[in-house]
């Protein structure tokens, strides 16, 4: 499909022809976005549409006709595609088509240079031979009924998940018992899991051995460099939010409040978050909130959902959260993707200046996300006067991130 797009483009007839993809592999909005971004004029996901039709007939929980169900599926794909486009500031399909606004992870340079010529890649991976062998295996498999693949929800014997039921059970056991052996068993499960993320592929040479014991002063100095990613009260429960703050304060590190404010009763105690975040919605940002900080953090983007704003569903906005965010209970709270008072480096410099005027001794960090070219953005942020630049990776997420972003958006570093 990609080669056909390149062929007609190189011949100068791309604008005179349409590419319609008929595929049984397209399932969700990410699949659709990939096809459009690599040149498809239209996509017909025939297998997904047929599956939706069958579900509407067999399901006892819906009164939708097959046509209505298929139309709902089409609308969901369109809405998801618009969401993906909006992350990059694009509002029309014609501007997104052929843009190749993706990053390749897991394919070698030979494939990228031949097929995804204008797409960024920073890793090596599998090649044509591996893909060809896989296709041969799939072609030889006879028709069998396949179960749910386990891509989103963990299934035994299916795709590996970082937070598997086994891992969660061991964590719960360690927390409830307070036994260090149980905690050690939980950590061992994490460290010896199957390779799921790129960092799981990194290993230290066997010749390197660390037998040196650190004294308490050296450990304290190391712990001061540790921070916990900012996650808001609402995305996390009050108990989890306070536990993270207290744990980091006890070892001398820092935790982030996230967007949404913090209970004033925690200020000046061991439950206070040292890093206070200022995000696009400005929820919970008050003079007292800022005065309790040891570091200000301006959130320009979030690692697990770059280009998206925050959204806290109304059912999560109880009386306590509504009070902290100075809003109404039960109302969905939406933070826009951009800061509406920041449209240039000069605007960012003004906010940094205002924060430093409020507390000259408090460093200001700016949170960006990992992406190709982030270095250029970081230079501008440094020129704006930021003391610290935080680069959030793709797994810097919370319960407030949608599935499509968790699975497909952001880079590991």
Report the location of each language-model feature.
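Flexible, glycine-rich loop/tail regions that form catalytic "lids" or insertion modules at the edges
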Residues: 32, 44-47, 57-284, 293-306
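Short, small-residue-biased leader/transition segments that mark boundaries at the very start
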Residues: 3-8
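Conserved, mostly hydrophobic/aromatic
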Residues: 35, 92, 248, 348, ...
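Active-site beta-loop-alpha junctions enriched in small/polar residues
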Residues: 22-26, 48, 260-262, 301-303, ...
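Catalytic cores of alpha/beta
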Residues: 26-38, 372-384
């Amino acid at each position: 499909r990609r080669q056909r797009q390149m062929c007609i483009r190189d011949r100068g007839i791309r604008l005179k022809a349409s590419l319609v993809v008929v595929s049984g592999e397209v399932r969700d909005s990410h699949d659709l976005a990939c096809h459009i971004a690599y040149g498809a004029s239209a996509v017909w996901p025939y297998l997904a549409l047929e599956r939706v039709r069958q579900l509407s007939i067999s399901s006892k929980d819906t009164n939708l006709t097959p046509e209505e169900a298929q139309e709902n599926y089409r609308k969901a794909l369109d809405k998801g595609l618009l969401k993906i486009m909006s992350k990059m500031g694009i509002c029309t399909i014609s501007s997104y088509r052929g843009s190749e606004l993706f990053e390749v992870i897991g394919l070698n340079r030979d494939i990228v240079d031949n097929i995804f010529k204008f797409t960024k890649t920073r890793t090596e991976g599998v090649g044509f031979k591996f893909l060809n062998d896989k296709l041969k295996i799939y072609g030889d498999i006879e028709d069998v009924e396949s179960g749910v693949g386990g891509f989103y929800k963990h299934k035994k014997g299916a795709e590996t998940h970082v937070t598997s039921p086994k891992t969660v059970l061991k964590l719960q056991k360690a927390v409830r018992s307070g036994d260090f052996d149980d905690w050690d068993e939980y950590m061992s499960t994490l460290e010896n899991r199957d390779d799921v993320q790129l960092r799981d592929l990194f290993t230290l040479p066997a010749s390197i051995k660390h037998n040196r014991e650190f004294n308490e002063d050296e450990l304290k100095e190391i712990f001061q460099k540790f921070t916990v990613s900012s996650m808001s009260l609402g995305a996390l429960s009050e108990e989890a939010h306070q536990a993270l703050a207290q744990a980091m304060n006890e070892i001398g590190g820092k935790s982030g409040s996230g967007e949404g404010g913090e209970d004033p009763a925690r200020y000046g105690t061991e439950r206070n978050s040292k890093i206070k975040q200022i995000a696009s919605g400005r929820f919970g940002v008050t003079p007292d909130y800022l005065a309790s900080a040891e570091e200000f953090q301006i959130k320009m983007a979030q690692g697990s959902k770059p280009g998206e704003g925050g959204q806290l569903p109304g059912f999560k906005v109880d009386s306590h959260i509504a009070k902290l965010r100075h809003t109404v209970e039960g109302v969905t709270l939406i933070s826009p993707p951009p800061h509406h008072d920041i449209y240039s480096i000069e605007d960012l410099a003004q906010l940094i200046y205002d924060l430093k005027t409020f507390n000259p001794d408090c460093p200001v960090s700016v949170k960006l996300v990992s992406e190709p070219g982030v270095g250029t953005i970081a230079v501008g942020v440094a020129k704006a006067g930021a003391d610290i630049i935080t680069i959030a990776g793709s797994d810097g997420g919370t319960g407030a991130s949608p599935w499509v972003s968790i699975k497909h958006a952001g880079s590991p570093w």
